[in-house]
């Protein structure tokens, strides 16, 4: 299995994500480069309770955003709110955006929700607010990992690369045996 070296670090997650673990930044680089199955790798950046917009802003503005966000970055903030006093996801997104700008001391463009054209130039920030508990995650992968690689020409594939890799891994296939690909890799 591709995560065997990391099994001692992995713990089940209650948020529906398959794995959660702690590691160094260098390990995240390695994971993004070598893993075939994940779509993206998120860095759990902050967790705190937020019962009001003022509290949300105050706690968000104190985070060291300069560790992951440059001053010319276009932000793509995706927010979901469930069973919380702060239920308006656009207002939560606005407060997080304002907090980041205030912290960095500059204006940052906020990508519109329908602007998917320049994903590689955007920094994805995922904000989840559930039962008044806020979690901020920063995408470390850029484009989805199934889009990586140099492909001059390609056809529309019946499966994404990471889903195909997951199926092959789950099948128990070993590299020393031939693999028959009925789709011929599209």
Functional labels for PLM-detected ranges:
Residues 159-186:
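Conserved S-adenosyl-L-methionine
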